[in-house]
């Protein structure tokens, strides 16, 4: 039994899971928050118990030391030698990385080179990698990229209709995100359908505060809704999704905002929050809509209709559809959104069973009996995907 740590490092946080492989069982999981600030918070859950500790954690290396000390101190692992691999989530791999990869100095340099494509995330991911390298220098580490799964997209999907030299010189193209999640749920769908993934055309809907749709044909991503950044595509919690690019100078002119301020508005004050004016949380919006709040109802309509359009579009891209998968916070838990997204698609063989659809947070087939297209709710598990890739590349 191999023990693998899956890591997701943020600028002031470190999310972790210790997994037993190949069983894929979680031994411990937790989070370090407020790294570099006063009163950092360390939370760990193991053996059915949760422990919380508040102390100053100056940097990610200190967070890693505290985590490892806690794992051994509580007897969760007998010694650090039990850890056979570390898998790091890295948001952006650019065109350089089309698969997960064992981290070497050269790889780390490559991740740093593409950091300008994800300035908010990659530097934090790199900090996490370096922190573990400092504390566990002899344990192999693997980088698992959110963008890698979408590197199979053809040029017809990833190129923008801009001067071609922008792509050649600056790497301006569609990259797509949530790749680790889309990969996990589409492979899981194939298992549940007892059909080789090579034979399937799957539409994957990762719907959380960030949301993206992927067309996965034969196990490969051939198109996805997010673009050069995670701002593109469908309406999200606080992100606008696709808009007319000419709106940016227009908004600047009307509001007096700078380009940076407009981009911040598109990222943090738009989407469901922008339309409702009160929340980016779908649960709040559904509750308000039930009580007759018109803007909440409009927000739900906009959110669902943007996703609905991709179902038809990507079914056309794949030459048909065998399954639709819903995952992430909203996809797994909101029967209302699933129903709205799938409404009126029976002409395509997509027919949701309203009774079966009344499911939250667990695997379930929710299509009507005999419907040609399977509709499946699958809770995502990016950590398991990270651990699988770590084992695949280090064993």
From Swiss-Prot:
Catalytic activity: acetate + ATP = acetyl phosphate + ADP
Binding sites annotated in the UniProt record for Mg(2+): 8, 382
Record site feature (Transition state stabilizer), residues: 178, 239
GO annotation, biological process: acetate metabolic process; acetyl-CoA biosynthetic process
EC number: 2.7.2.1
InterPro entries with a match to the protein in the record: Ac/propionate_kinase, Aliphatic_acid_kin_short-chain, Aliphatic_acid_kinase_CS, ATPase_NBD
Main location class: cytoplasm
Name under which the protein is recorded: Acetate kinase
Protein role: Catalyzes the formation of acetyl phosphate from acetate and ATP. Can also catalyze the reverse reaction.
Cellular component annotations (GO), alphabetically ordered: cytoplasm
Cofactor names: Mg(2+); Mn(2+)
Subunit structure: Homodimer.
Chain residues that bind substrate: 89
Keywords attached to this entry: ATP-binding, Cytoplasm, Kinase, Magnesium, Metal-binding, Nucleotide-binding, Transferase
Family designation: Belongs to the acetokinase family.
Gene (UniProt): ackA
Location in the cell: Cytoplasm
Binding annotation for ATP: 15, 206-210, 281-283, 329-333
Cofactor, how bound (note): Mg(2+). Can also accept Mn(2+).
């Amino acid at each position: 039994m191999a023990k693998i740590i899956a890591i997701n490092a943020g600028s002031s946080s470190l999310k972790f899971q210790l997994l037993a492989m190949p069983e894929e069982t979680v031994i411990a999981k937790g989070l370090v928050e407020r790294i570099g600030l006063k009163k950092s918070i360390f939370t760990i859950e193991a053996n059915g118990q949760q422990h919380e500790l508040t102390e100053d954690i100056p940097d990610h290396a200190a967070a890693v030391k505290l985590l490892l000390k806690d794992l051994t101190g509580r007897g969760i692992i007998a010694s650090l030698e039990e850890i056979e691999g570390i898998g790091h989530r890295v948001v952006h791999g650019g065109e350089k990385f089309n698969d997960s990869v064992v981290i070497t100095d050269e790889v780390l340099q490559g991740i740093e080179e593409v950091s300008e494509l994800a300035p908010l995330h990659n530097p934090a991911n790199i900090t996490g990698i370096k922190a573990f390298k400092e504390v566990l220098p002899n344990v192999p580490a693997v980088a698992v990229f959110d963008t890698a799964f979408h590197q199979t997209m053809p040029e017809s999907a990833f190129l923008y209709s801009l001067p071609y030299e922008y792509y050649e010189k600056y790497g301006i193209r569609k990259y797509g995100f949530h790749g680790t999640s889309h990969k996990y749920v589409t492979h899981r769908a194939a298992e549940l359908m007892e059909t080789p993934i090579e034979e399937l055309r799957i539409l994957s809907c990762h719907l959380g505060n960030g949301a993206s749709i992927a067309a996965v044909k034969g196990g490969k991503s051939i198109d996805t809704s997010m673009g050069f950044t995670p701002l593109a595509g469908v309406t999200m919690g606080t992100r606008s999704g696709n808009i007319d690019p000419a709106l940016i100078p227009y908004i600047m002119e009307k509001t007096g905002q700078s380009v940076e301020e407009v981009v911040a508005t598109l990222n943090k004050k738009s989407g469901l929050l922008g339309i409702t004016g009160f929340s980016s949380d779908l649960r709040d919006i559904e509750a308000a809509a039930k009580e007759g709040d018109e803007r909440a109802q409009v927000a739900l309509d906009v959110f669902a209709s943007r996703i609905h359009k991709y179902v038809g579009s990507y079914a056309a891209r794949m030459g048909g559809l065998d399954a639709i998968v819903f995952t992430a916070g909203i996809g797994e838990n909101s029967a209302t959104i699933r129903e709205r997204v799938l409404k009126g698609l029976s002409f395509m063989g997509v027919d949701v069973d309203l009774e079966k659809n009344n499911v939250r947070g667990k695997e379930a087939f929710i299509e009507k009996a005999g419907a040609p297209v399977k509709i499946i709710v699958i809770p995502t598990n990016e950590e398991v995907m990270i651990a699988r890739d770590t084992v695949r590349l280090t064993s």
